[in-house]
Regions:
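Conserved, well-structured core segments that form or line functional sites
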Residues: 2-156
Length: 156
């Protein structure tokens, strides 16, 4: 993942491993560029979550709050992996894990601006919807890059 703040720079796994808290994780990922095949997206909205109730960043809204399960285990693993889940039984949403291995944390990717691959995304999205809405909202963002549960655990 590269980050644009005047110039492109890489958000490394080491950076995500050493994040001190959810706010820092969100700020690290906000503005970065996610590339999936021929599509490049600049992340413009995120939601950062802490982890378990007994962890360093307890967060009741986090999928990891009640502990590790088969569904959320990616959030407890090494930093820089996708945690993909189905929302409302129909939309796939993406989080990027952060923090040290064994400590849960995730940043939900809520919205992005498409920088490259407009033709690919337009074939996946409704022709009646304006292009600035194709990756607005976590479900739309996931659909724009065709994320599925098979992508869960993928390195970013």
């Amino acid at each position: 993942m590269s980050q644009r703040r005047g110039h492109n720079r890489r958000v490394s796994i080491e950076t995500l491993e050493n994040v001190e808290n959810p706010l820092e994780a969100g700020l690290t990922i906000l503005g970065s560029t996610l590339t999936v095949d021929d599509i490049s997206l600049r992340i413009v909205e995120v939601e950062a979550y802490g982890g378990e109730k007994d962890g360093p960043w307890p967060d009741p809204a986090a999928h990891s709050y009640r502990g590790r399960t088969p569904r959320n285990s990616v959030m407890f693993g090494r930093a820089g992996r996708l945690y993909v889940y189905r929302s409302y039984g129909m939309h796939f949403c993406m989080n990027i894990s952060y923090g040290p291995d064994g400590v849960a944390g995730g940043v939900l990717l809520r919205a992005a601006e498409i920088e490259a691959g407009h033709d690919v995304v337009s074939a996946r999205r409704s022709p009646d919807r304006p292009s600035h809405q194709w990756a607005r909202g976590p479900g739309n963002l996931g659909a724009s890059v065709a994320i599925t549960l098979a992508d869960n655990g993928t390195d970013v």
